[in-house]
Amino acid sequence: MSQSDLHQQKFHWQGRHDAEDGKLGQRIHHVVKHQKTSELEKASQGVSILGFATDAGVARNKGRIGAKKAPDLIRRALANLAWHKDAPLYDLGTVVCDDDLLEESQSRCANLISEALPHTPTIVLGGGHEIAWASFSGLAEYFKTHHPEKKPKIGIINFDAHFDLRAFESSLADVKPSSGTPFNQIHHFCQRNDWAFHYACLGVSRSSNTQALFQKADELNVWYVEDSQLNYLNHSYHLTQLQHFIDDCDYLYLTIDLDVFPAATAPGVSAPAARGVSYDTIAPFLERILHYKNKLMLADIAEYNPNYDVDSQTARLAARLCWDIANAMADKEHKRQPIK
């Protein structure tokens, strides 16, 4: 593992300062603290933010690279947002994937997540959606270390135009783990460890997923809602389904691929959506998930690609999503809920 795999240069948080407002004028950049995971035990209750600078998985998936530059640009958009909570935020730095060393950097990212979770809920800023395998691996490592006797029921909720259930190993083709494979990798992990696989994909596009992927989703009993079905007429029904999904799980892992939003809202992604799902449409589902903050241990935001952004609007969208999640996590009970 090279020295470059973790940023030695810390992100410099800065932004507007309204001295006349005192503490009531605080913004994210005022409260965030650089912290090592080894120091979190001494820290007060808060929320950790970790960057994962990677687009190696996107390249392997034949996508448009650029997401590697995303974490610090999301931080920059996040810095000036107002912060109304007493809970601090901790910046754990950024894991960097160089030279297609995806598996090694995913392992490093997972280790940091597993070290942070005993003390704080964590938000990971990607990076391509290969970050999802690192995120779940860190969550799994946390449970195996701290609750080895239990098999946690983890609900994975993915807002995404794609299932990301592609094969990551095959005798018929030369395939590798990529941004298109993480939830298939997670399924294989759950199968090997006799854990239940609870996966929901909301906003999936029929035009962007082949019959093979829909068949795979059906085989794995994935609960999915297509982009064309996510509308105000169907809100009540799908929110009820989401409630059942949440009720069936002890813990939640939320992952948001920014390509679920329309290209007009999120142009800065590898695979922009011609249709997509509006933020207003997704908001009630996100609010329902965040209501269960004591189940929500981990979240990540994936696929921001600054190479194709317009006036940083996708960065601001990612930052607002991070802000929404952090606000909910900041009110989380500090003591971990027991596994049922």
Curated annotation (Swiss-Prot):
CDD domains: Formimidoylglutamase. Mn(2+) 2 binds at residues 160, 162, 257, 259. Catalyzes the conversion of N-formimidoyl-L-glutamate to L-glutamate and formamide. One of its GO terms (molecular function) is formimidoylglutamase activity. The keyword Metal-binding applies. Belongs to the arginase family. It catalyses: N-formimidoyl-L-glutamate + H2O = formamide + L-glutamate. Its cofactor is Mn(2+). Gene3D superfamilies: Ureohydrolase domain (3.40.800.10). GO terms for biological process: L-histidine catabolic process to glutamate and formamide; L-histidine catabolic process to glutamate and formate; putrescine biosynthetic process from arginine, via agmatine. Its EC number is 3.5.3.8. Pfam families: Arginase. It comes from Vibrio parahaemolyticus serotype O3:K6 (strain RIMD 2210633). Pathway: Amino-acid degradation; L-histidine degradation into L-glutamate; L-glutamate from N-formimidoyl-L-glutamate (hydrolase route): step 1/1. Binds 2 manganese ions per subunit. Keywords: Histidine metabolism, Hydrolase, Manganese, Metal-binding. Mn(2+) 1 binds at residues 129, 160, 164, 257. It is an enzyme of class 3 (hydrolase). This is Formimidoylglutamase.
